[in-house]
């Protein structure tokens, strides 16, 4: 679907969608651990729906009312579909191994390109057998033998999270090396704690205690990586209140508050469960480390396109292995609005050039589409946005939320 967006900005209120980093973990762990859970504030993004379908394939009964209730009755599935969800693929791989399943995992084309090697290597040492096929991977853990593990987390913290879930359901300890995005490990620890699993953690070493709890009721906190789009828009356009954001969140992308407040004349106001963003002037260059916050790179790059300060994206090469090659796509988006790009081995710098307005923008990556829309609204350009349906992967309510800020969609 292709759309244009019209209207004039007005101050408004946004409810941040659910953090799928939390919701996917809760859904999958409930299904594989046989522990029921009731979840409030689930936005039903494509990635969350994939996790729910995996839970169903494992025998879980799913009920939808004002909240989402998962009543598991675990059985090893013959097959599951991970779609384009890297999180579901990696977490389910460890969980299937823990339950000694023989299962085929379907993957969409883009997911087949994303790394899984380090996780496969660690599980293979436990006699888990993997066979790569054209449209997915076959895992056979029927003869697996649990033991202590070492995992290299240098390419993805999800490998570490997957093995943490594996050991929480089996036995043995875990040593994780070269952990990137350590706050995602904290999300996994909180998930396990909420299911009654105690986690001892010290310098990448993890041990697990098992006191399983029943009948959990959990409210999923709002997602900072989704809120980032509105934060950037508000910095250029005016006041936006964003609700359902915990001030003490362990989400790594909550770092956006300190990143912005460190360079902004007007600070983001922070309350217990909401923030307020104001139009501001920037006082210095912005630095974003992709090893810590890869999902913030697309929206924060917009600041370099339209402001007097530069955006420095550190460790940018890691962007190559996201849902798309976001390194190339950020450069494409920035240049389409006239920005200047400089690169060295470890840093990409985006600076404002002579502002230009593209006639159309075409990305398949959900975060790039939403970032482009925010850039277009800041520029006030008449732009055709393509593949708009792909934003459902993470933020199905994005277009509706635009209406809270004075905009409307022309299809």
Curated annotation (Swiss-Prot):
UniProt family annotation: Belongs to the EPSP synthase family.
Binding-site positions, phosphoenolpyruvate: 20, 86, 114, 158, 326, 367, 393
Keyword Cytoplasm tagged: yes
Catalytic residue list: 295 (proton acceptor)
A GO molecular-function annotation: 3-phosphoshikimate 1-carboxyvinyltransferase activity
Gene name in the database record: aroA
GO process terms (BP): amino acid biosynthetic process; aromatic amino acid family biosynthetic process; chorismate biosynthetic process
GO CC aspect terms: cytoplasm
Descriptive protein name: 3-phosphoshikimate 1-carboxyvinyltransferase
Residues that hold 3-phosphoshikimate according to the record: 20-21, 25, 156-158, 181, 295, 322
Keywords, in A-Z order: Amino-acid biosynthesis, Aromatic amino acid biosynthesis, Cytoplasm, Transferase
Biological role stated in the UniProt entry: Catalyzes the transfer of the enolpyruvyl moiety of phosphoenolpyruvate (PEP) to the 5-hydroxyl of shikimate-3-phosphate (S3P) to produce enolpyruvyl shikimate-3-phosphate and inorganic phosphate.
Oligomeric form and interacting partners: Monomer.
Reactions performed catalytically: 3-phosphoshikimate + phosphoenolpyruvate = 5-O-(1-carboxyvinyl)-3-phosphoshikimate + phosphate
Pfam annotation, one family: EPSP_synthase
Organism of origin: Picrophilus torridus (strain ATCC 700027 / DSM 9790 / JCM 10055 / NBRC 100828 / KAW 2/3)
Entry EC no(s): 2.5.1.19
Enzymatic class: transferase
């Amino acid at each position: 679907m292709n759309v244009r967006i019209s209207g004039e900005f007005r101050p408004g209120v946004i409810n941040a969608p659910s953090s799928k980093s939390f919701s996917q973990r809760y859904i999958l762990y409930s299904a594989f651990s046989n522990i029921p859970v009731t979840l409030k504030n689930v936005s039903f993004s494509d990635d969350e729906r994939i996790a729910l379908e995996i839970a169903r394939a494992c025998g879980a009964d799913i009920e939808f009312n004002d909240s989402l209730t998962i009543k598991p009755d675990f059985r090893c599935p013959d097959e599951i579909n991970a779609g384009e969800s890297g999180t579901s693929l990696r977490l389910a791989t460890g969980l299937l191994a823990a339950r000694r399943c023989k299962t085929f995992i379907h993957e969409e084309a883009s997911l087949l390109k994303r790394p899984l090697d380090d996780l496969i290597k660690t599980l293979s040492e436990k006699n888990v057998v993997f066979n790569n096929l054209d449209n997915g991977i076959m895992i056979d853990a029927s003869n697996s033998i649990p033991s202590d593990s070492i995992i290299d987390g240098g390419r993805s913290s999800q490998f570490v999270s997957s093995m943490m879930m594996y050991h929480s359901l089996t036995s043995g300890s875990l040593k994780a090396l070269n952990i990137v995005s350590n706050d995602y490990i904290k999300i996994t620890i909180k998930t396990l704690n909420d299911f009654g699993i105690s986690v001892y953690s010290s310098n990448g070493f993890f041990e697990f205690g098992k006191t399983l709890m029943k009948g959990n009721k959990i409210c999923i906190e709002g997602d900072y990586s989704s809120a980032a789009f509105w934060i950037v828009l508000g910095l250029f356009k005016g006041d936006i209140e964003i609700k359902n954001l915990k001030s003490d969140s362990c989400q790594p992308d909550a770092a956006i508050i300190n990143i912005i407040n460190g360079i902004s004349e007007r600070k983001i106001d922070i309350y217990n469960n909401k923030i307020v963003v104001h139009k501001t002037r920037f006082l210095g260059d912005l630095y974003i480390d992709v090893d810590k916050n890869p999902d913030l790179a697309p929206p924060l790059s917009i600041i370099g396109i339209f402001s007097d300060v530069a955006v420095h994206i550190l460790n940018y090469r890691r962007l190559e292995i996201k849902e798309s090659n976001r390194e190339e796509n950020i450069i494409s988006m920035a240049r389409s609005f006239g920005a200047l790009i400089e690169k060295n081995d470890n840093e990409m710098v985006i600076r404002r050039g002579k502002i230009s307005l593209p006639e159309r923008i075409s990305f398949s990556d959900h975060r790039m589409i939403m970032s482009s829309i925010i850039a277009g609204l800041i520029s006030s350009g008449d732009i055709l946005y393509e593949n708009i349906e792909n934003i459902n992967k993470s933020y199905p309510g994005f277009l509706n939320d635009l209406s809270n800020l004075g905009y409307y969609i022309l299809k």
